[in-house]
Design a protein with these regions (language model features):
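Amphipathic, interface-forming alpha-helical segments with heptad-repeat character
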Residues: 6, 13, 47-161
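Domain-core and long-helix interface of multi-subunit machines
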Residues: 1-50, 108, 112
């Protein structure tokens, strides 16, 4: 059955045919398609924000501290992101739920990486140094997250931590 679909300018669309080859891709596409032989992935190009709070970070002198913050990130490699996260588009009604699930998975991945980076950083500090190292930690997280292999592998780019 032939259908028509129009996507927003903030949505990157990848359309594949029955042979698995990409037929078209780009921002805000508008096209007719056969839903029996066409696969569509819709990846948002907007920035995402997520918060974290860890209560189980241990310092060098075995003191427990809490660390919290926010992370902003975008998808900058749409094909890599679509391979690692399900962005398949079936109909407009289910897309919002699918996008919410995808964002949740991406946020969990990034938060896991952030927790590892923070734990390693704080493990080298005593409690006094840890409490006073807020700016140093932020700078280290910004630098390490922007170049982290796993973040790049998922097609993501961290804007700010």
């Amino acid at each position: 059955m032939l259908k028509h679909i129009n996507f927003q300018a903030t949505e990157y669309v990848i359309v594949t045919g029955g042979n698995g080859r990409i037929k078209k891709q780009g921002y805000g596409l508008d096209f007719f398609y056969n839903n029996a032989s066409t696969s569509i992935k819709v990846i948002p190009s907007i920035a995402f924000d997520t918060s974290y709070m860890f209560n189980d970070i241990i310092t060098h002198d075995f003191q427990n501290i809490s660390v919290q913050g926010d992370i902003s990130y975008v998808i900058d490699d749409f094909e890599a992101a679509s391979e690692k996260t399900d962005f398949s588009f079936i109909n407009p009604e289910d897309y919002a739920e699918k996008l919410s699930e995808a964002q949740s998975k991406m946020s969990k991945r990034i938060i896991g990486i952030v927790k590892t980076e923070i734990a390693q950083f704080m493990a080298a500090k005593d409690i006094r140094a840890a409490i006073q190292s807020q700016n140093e930690l932020a700078a280290k997280l910004n630098e390490s997250m922007k170049h982290h292999t796993y973040v790049r592998e998922f097609g993501l780019s961290v804007i700010n931590v």
